[in-house]
Amino acid sequence: GRIILPFTLLRRLECVLDATKADVLAQADKVATMGLPEEAEEKMLLRAAGLSFFNTSKMDLGKLGESGIAANLESYVQSFSKDAREIFEHFKFTEFIGQLGDVNLLFKVVQKVRTADLSPAAISNHEMGLVFEELIRRFAEGSNETAGEHFTPRDIVRLTTSLVFMEDDDALTKPGII
């Protein structure tokens, strides 16, 4: 369960970056020759991506290849901007790469993930948020944790919010009610 979430995120990031990948790669080549501090390089690459993250690898999930896939995938993830890399560190993604590689499943997982169209044109940010929430909920249930510790379903949030903002304004304005 914990493996699917970071791979889903990886694929979503890749799909989102697809539109500006060529611009980022061109800018990365320019920036590499300038001798700028890492922070300045990152700002220029973020500007080229037009997003709050980027990836400077010429690879993508479809180009990793079966031979050396663990090293290639690790290199690909390390080519993301600092904030995106930190997310994968919190997922302990490197450990999952090693575990899947040890049992010869890494290439198969990558091949399955890369076929999913998680582009913004296919799945809106709102819908993608719902996908992530559902994955988190399912994995919390699967690990015998209480799902409510990690997840509050949207219908419960809507119900609670509607109760708080009900039309009965007079009831809420009387002294001693709240």
Model-derived features: where do they sit?
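Non-catalytic, mostly N-terminal accessory regions of nucleic-acid modification and defense proteins
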Residues: 1-169
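Conserved class I S-adenosyl-L-methionine
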Residues: 170-178
